[in-house]
Amino acid sequence: MHALWSRGAIFSSTSIKRYNSRMRFPRLLLLIVLASPAWAGVVENVREALASNSFTAADIYLKSYRDKNGVTPEYIEAYSWMARTALNDRDYDQAQAYAKQTESLALEQIKQHPLDSEPHLAIGLGAAIEVESQTLAAKGQHEQAIAVLRTALHAYGDTSIRARLQKNLNLLSFDGKPAPALHADQFLGSKPPALAQLKGTPVLLFFWAHWCGDCKAEAPIITKLRTEYASKGLTVVGPTRLYGYTAQVENAAPADELAYIDAVRKRFYGGLLDMPVPISKYNFDTYGASTTPTLVLLDRAGKVAMYHPGALPYDELKAEIEKVVAR
């Protein structure tokens, strides 16, 4: 397919027609876009344009920023949103093209400095690999998608994007697999039992973070369902991890953050205070819990019956639990 290039963007000729037809810009809006100062944040500008269904405006922001600043980690993260949005629009060929270009730009940056030296760079590369794998899966190329993620995990398994890569691999391959053991050397609440000891009962793993508003909103739902299915043996375990900061302290010592997590737990998770809370980054990496909450339901054989990054409403989570307890 013939492709048209603008500075920092790839469009097929048919995609340009389709995307431009979504929103026709008056001249005044184009002038406003071009006049936007770099300090406004190219990531924010691109996301806002894409939220308004305008790839055209997003491309203008990217071109303007790149003309002034060149390719930077922030530019790469902003560009990754083109891939993410095309994927969301189910334009898989375009999403794949954006993802590959994002990855190519990121790899050039990595030659100059480590991936985790700049958060924008890690976010952009992680998003690119995520989109590439999800696009392949959506096109029915399941094994190729898994291969992309396994290759990426081999290359970046010791970086900040490890959990994100594992999440995407788990989405494609976790169902029906034995649940990995949890590390529980450090914990809050009651002592976490080994998952192997819980075979014979359904288990819900509720991965949460002290800063996570969606986790706090999910807690009453889980509390209610735990009560409703207590007679069926439903056990809830709530893994969390240290992030190196609290709401008050940017660089918190581990002991201080642990105390803060306990305070958050007591304030917002009152119905789950007896829930075992193993604290380990390893658990988050292994289960791919880069999204919080992440909900993982295990059947009575200790195998993964549901893997869901993100919150679930009461009715949907109840339906999943019902499937497991009915077996």
Q: Model-derived features: where do they sit?
A:
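Flexible helix-coil transition and linker loops at the boundaries of alpha-helical arrays
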Residues: R66-Y75, L105-A122
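N-proximal helix/coil linker or "cap" segments that precede and/or mark the start of modular domains
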Residues: H142-D185, A196-K199
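Short active-site neighborhood of thiol/selenol oxidoreductases, capturing the structured segment around
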Residues: P192-K216, I222
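Structural microenvironment flanking redox-active thiols in thiol-disulfide oxidoreductases
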Residues: A217-F268, P276-D285
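Thiol/disulfide oxidoreductase modules built on the thioredoxin-like
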Residues: R267-E322
